[in-house]
Amino acid sequence: MVGSRTSPIFNALRVELNAREAELVEIPLIQPADPFLDMAGEDLRRRIFLTENENGDSLCLRPEFTIPVCRNHIALNAATPKRYAYLGEVFRQRRDGAAEFLQAGIEDLGAADEAASDARSLADALSCVKAIAPDAPLEIVLGDQSVFAGMLKALGLPQGWRKKLLRSFGDAHSMDLALAELTGTQRRDPLPESLAVLVAEGDEIGLARMLEAEMLEAGISPGAGRTPVEIARRLIEKEDLAATHFPAAALDLLRQFLAIRVSLDTAAVTLRAFAADNALDLGAVLQKFEARADAIAQAGIEMKDIIYDASFGRPLDYYTGLVYEIRDASNRQDGVLAGGGRYDRLLTMLGACEAIPGVGFSIWLDRLQALAGEKQ
């Protein structure tokens, strides 16, 4: 494993986390797989190490910390606001590099001031990285899924298409395919007739049964990856979406929006000008955007050193607002040192009885170790 629990970086990060008013929690290595398969996003789903217990329940090696930390909070029925820190191994299938590596981070749950807690998350992540690599050239990229969602609403897109495009947010290839589909320029492979009839009728239950039977016949476990019900729902949704096309002028505006990439100190002005020039109602989301930018400045972070990229998202489905990454500016290929964002619906999806907002970040210790030049 790259990055050892006995390394100076591990111990230094423990000190940093302890200094940030967060309770250090221990999370079991073996986790129920369904929450990750349902909520973590396609990219992470493909990388999970899956297994089953003797009862046939799907389990996995812990692929990340946010979901299990939130589940632990719900199980304890803990009061909020509450800050949790973690430091330990995660397991992901990767083409290059070790499948087991260390992550550290903080999850901030239930804070009432969204702008202040967003800014604190970014400031904490940046401080932890700089504590280990104080002289490293860093690049900070920030996006906002809620601004993108506001843009889709302002353009008048149907709800189904908004959901599809939000799932593609941050993935340039997926977004290009979705936009091509929306314009009717993307050819779709036809389904087998037996499936196509059920899709056309919107028969989700019948379709799921047929898919499950075909998976079992092919020797594929229905619990591995997407479930038959989820696949059926997606196929029916795709059929509904295929019947909707959108004016080229509106799609051109969406592409112009996604091309916005400016420093954070000019981002709000740029977005307001874009909205005004194109008669788009983005007032509510931009007020939140500006409040967060002000809070980031008050946290002592230079806004001119942060890039706002309107197309930037992170490959996890549970984010709802702020997303950010801190990168090694000298390594464009694999230079993400820390990443985080806001996930205000996640705890409700995991079973919390009331809405609990959340924001957090994770640090990759192996990459930080390589950047800091630590000797083994």
Swiss-Prot record:
Cystine residue pairs: none
Locations listed in the record: Cytoplasm
Pfam short name (any one): tRNA-synt_His
SUPFAM superfamilies with a match to the protein in the record: Class II aaRS and biotin synthetases
Subcellular location, principal: cytoplasm
Recorded metabolic or biological pathway in which this protein acts: Amino-acid biosynthesis; L-histidine biosynthesis; L-histidine from 5-phospho-alpha-D-ribose 1-diphosphate: step 1/9
UniProt KW Cytoplasm keyword: yes
GO MF assignments: histidine-tRNA ligase activity
UniProt key word Cytoplasm: yes
Assigned keywords, A-Z: Amino-acid biosynthesis, Cytoplasm, Histidine biosynthesis
Entry GO CC: cytoplasm
Gene Ontology process terms (BP): histidyl-tRNA aminoacylation; L-histidine biosynthetic process
Function: Required for the first step of histidine biosynthesis. May allow the feedback regulation of ATP phosphoribosyltransferase activity by histidine.
Note: This function is generally fulfilled by the C-terminal part of HisG, which is missing in some bacteria such as this one.
Subunit (UniProt): Heteromultimer composed of HisG and HisZ subunits.
Family: Belongs to the class-II aminoacyl-tRNA synthetase family. HisZ subfamily.
Name this protein carries in UniProt: ATP phosphoribosyltransferase regulatory subunit
Native organism: Brucella canis (strain ATCC 23365 / NCTC 10854 / RM-666)
Lineage of source species: Bacteria, Pseudomonadati, Pseudomonadota, Alphaproteobacteria, Hyphomicrobiales
Gene: hisZ
